[in-house]
């Protein structure tokens, strides 16, 4: 059998979890000596393709960490690291490990086999990961199909990861229209419409109106949600729309002349909703209020915080003016240490000091625990000499021009003062 003829079992049955296969090729992974790249005669593992993340699982007792199409061939990357063969702690592939009758941990129940060409292997996909991806992808099809039929926009970008699904559309959609599309998708989900997968002939395809992001060579696989979408797609899908569960728009933004919409479906949407509910409950407790008043409370808190920051800034500025006035006048150099001063204020202070002092004017803001940021200026001397001393003695970072340098140093005030005594 040619390596290009790997049978895609996931095309035949998207709900199959386990399978048998023969290893056609097994080569060390070039990037990691604990991993091998394996080609099979048939596979249930869907590779990263069409913007969707690949299936995970076990193969021959070892953990499958990646599935890619390399040189046109589905390639499974397995990790042979000791103790790392299971589906990330999934109960169905682990059992209790006992020592002298006592439970000491968990161990893999999958029997490991030799990884070599010609060896027969048993494979098992991570079903939860697969099904969650199926929910996302089927939901995306309905959303994109509705957008296409209502607005005529194309889905020009698609990415499905474990945390979010993003869709890039070729035109701008208003927030109100996005909300309407979301509602219509969930209506379609509630109808529990059977999803159809077909392989039309070239003649049938010529007369079929369908969405496709790219030009497809060879046999085209069509996924149809009757009444909502017809699209060329290579990925596994749920059997009916009801299995999607729900679709929720998480975010949207204008992007490259169109709009990028982020969604979650099914159990991933449920988990996101659960997290948001937990956050809302915590905020209700913090503000001692109901859900409807949270935004108002946060807005008031933000305004109060900004007011306090302004008052604090005014007080610090007055204190800084006082400290500057107290600096010795009969010296060439000026050095100030003050915590909580922003960079612009510190720079303005240094700019004022260089008009009064002929040597170096240095401002350090911070504390011994977190370290200090500094700005050093001079009209008559090269500030890089001071920066170099701080760098050589204390590992300071930064630099600049002879008239002014800026940087940071992780050291105590006393240590900085010792270095300054040597160079000022």
Give the role of each language-model region.
Residues 1-424:
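A glycine- and charged-residue-rich anion-binding loop/surface
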């Amino acid at each position: 059998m040619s390596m290009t003829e790997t049978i895609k079992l996931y095309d035949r049955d998207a709900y199959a979890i386990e399978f048998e296969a023969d290893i056609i090729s097994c080569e060390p992974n070039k990037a990691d000596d604990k991993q091998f790249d394996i080609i099979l005669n048939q596979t249930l593992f869907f590779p990263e393709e069409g913007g969707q993340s690949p299936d995970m699982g076990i193969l021959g007792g070892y953990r499958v960490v990646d599935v890619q199409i390399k040189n046109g061939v589905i390639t499974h990357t397995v990790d042979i690291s000791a103790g790392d063969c299971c589906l990330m702690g999934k109960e169905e592939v682990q059992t209790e490990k006992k020592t002298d009758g006592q439970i000491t941990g968990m161990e893999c129940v999958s029997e490991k086999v030799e990884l070599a060409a010609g060896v027969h292997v048993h494979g098992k996909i991570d079903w939860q990961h697969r099904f969650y991806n199926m929910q996302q992808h089927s939901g995306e099809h309905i959303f994109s199909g509705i957008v296409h039929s209502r607005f005529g926009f194309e889905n020009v970008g698609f990415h499905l990861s474990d945390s979010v699904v993003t869709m890039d559309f070729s035109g701008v959609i208003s927030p109100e229209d996005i909300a309407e599309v979301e509602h219509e998708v969930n209506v379609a989900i509630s109808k529990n419409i059977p999803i159809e997968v077909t392989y039309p002939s070239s003649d049938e395809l010529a007369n079929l109106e369908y969405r496709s992001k790219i030009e497809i060579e060879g046999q085209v696989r069509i996924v149809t949600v009757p009444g909502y979408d017809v699209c060329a797609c290579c990925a596994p899908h749920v059997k009916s729309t009801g299995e999607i569960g729900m679709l929720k728009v998480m975010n949207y933004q204008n992007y490259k002349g169109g709009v990028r919409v982020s969604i979650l479906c099914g159990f991933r949407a449920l988990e996101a909703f659960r997290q948001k509910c937990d956050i809302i409950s915590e905020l209700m407790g913090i503000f001692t209020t109901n859900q409807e008043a949270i935004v108002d409370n946060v807005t008031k808190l933000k305004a109060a915080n900004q007011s306090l920051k302004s008052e604090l800034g005014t007080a610090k500025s007055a204190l800084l003016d006082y400290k500057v006035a107290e600096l010795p006048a009969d010296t060439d150099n000026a050095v100030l240490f003050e915590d909580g001063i922003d960079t612009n204020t510190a720079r303005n202070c240094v700019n004022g000091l260089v008009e009064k002092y002929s040597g170096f004017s240095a401002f350090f803001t911070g504390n011994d625990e977190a370290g200090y940021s500094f700005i050093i200026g001079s009209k008559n001397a090269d500030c890089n000499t001071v920066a170099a001393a701080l760098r050589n003695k204390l590992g300071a970072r930064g630099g600049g021009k002879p008239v002014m340098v800026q940087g940071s140093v992780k050291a105590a005030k006393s240590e900085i003062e010792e270095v300054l005594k040597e160079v000022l």
